[in-house]
Swiss-Prot record:
Renumbered residue ranges of the record's region Disordered: 197-225
CDD domains, per the entry: MukE
Oligomer status and interactors: Interacts, and probably forms a ternary complex, with MukF and MukB. The complex formation is stimulated by calcium or magnesium.
InterPro entries: MukE_C, MukE_N, Scp_MukE
A Gene Ontology biological process term: chromosome segregation
Biological role: Involved in chromosome condensation, segregation and cell cycle progression. May participate in facilitating chromosome segregation by condensation DNA from both sides of a centrally located replisome during cell division. Probably acts via its interaction with MukB and MukF.
Compartment(s) of residence: Cytoplasm, Nucleoid
Keyword field: Cell cycle, Cell division, Chromosome partition, Cytoplasm, DNA condensation
The protein's name: Chromosome partition protein MukE
GO CC terms in record: cytoplasm; nucleoid
Pfam families reported for this sequence: MukE
Gene name linked to the record: mukE
UniProt record similarity statement: Belongs to the MukE family.
């Protein structure tokens, strides 16, 4: 075993970080110690995770995550269609001028309103109830499902709740996993809008995956004080 890999595995940060990565969490610059650790040992950890048929990826935006291959030895499950749609909306909000104006903080209501503005409400309601009639009860269920999706994406490191107030959150750069394939000279925000409205296909690697076995047991480390 290479000396640097042995040092990485012996580091006290590694056990919790390894568990987080295996559960599908994205590690961005906000997690200073973990991110610096991955930067220092990236080359050796890439070889380590390759043994499990997963790739340690550092995205252009700087965050890290594990991308499973078809033969992965780490349990996985694919996010729901609504989870993916919420992720696309979060990416759109990240690109919006409002993010700077609001110091990067959004509310769950703003997320829900943007979702209804950009996506087809009838299709969204069908995701909750295939026989939806557009009733107030169906809309309430949709809002609850959106909250659940946001919480699931929090566990993936896409958003940070503001302290103990889960109604407010800050979006991280990891939402670019849901980003549109921006063409040369194109406006990123407009490309993201097309992705949401026209249902453009996302690259296969963007079909995010999560280890369900650890999902509920993950600590609420995505909160800010």
């Amino acid at each position: 075993m290479p000396v640097k890999l042995a040092q990485a595995l012996a580091n006290p940060l590694f056990p919790a970080l390894d568990s987080a990565l295996r559960s599908g969490r994205h590690i961005g610059l906000d997690e200073l110690d973990n991110h610096a650790f991955l930067m220092d040992f990236q080359e050796y950890l890439e070889e380590f995770y390759a043994r499990y048929n997963v790739e340690l990826i550092r995205a252009p935006e700087g965050f890290f995550y594990l991308r499973p291959r078809s033969t992965t030895l780490i349990p996985r499950s694919v996010l729901s269609e609504l989870d993916m749609m919420v992720g696309k909306i979060l990416c759109y909000l990240y690109l919006s001028p409002e993010r700077l104006a609001n110091e990067g903080i959004f509310t769950q209501q703003e997320l829900y309103d943007e979702l209804l503005t950009l996506a087809d409400e009838a299709k969204l309601l069908k995701l909750v109830n295939n026989r939806s009639t557009g009733s107030d009860v169906d809309r309430q269920k949709l809002q609850e499902k959106v909250r659940s999706s946001l919480n699931r994406l929090r566990r993936l490191g896409m958003v940070w709740f503001m302290g103990h107030d889960s109604s407010k959150f800050r979006i991280t750069e990891s939402v670019f996993r849901f980003g549109a394939d921006v063409r040369a000279g194109d406006d990123p925000r407009e490309a993201q809008r097309r992705l949401i409205r026209d249902g453009e296909a996302m690259p296969i690697e963007n079909h995010l995956q999560l280890n369900d076995e650890t999902e509920e047991s993950q600590p609420d480390s995505g909160e800010e004080e």
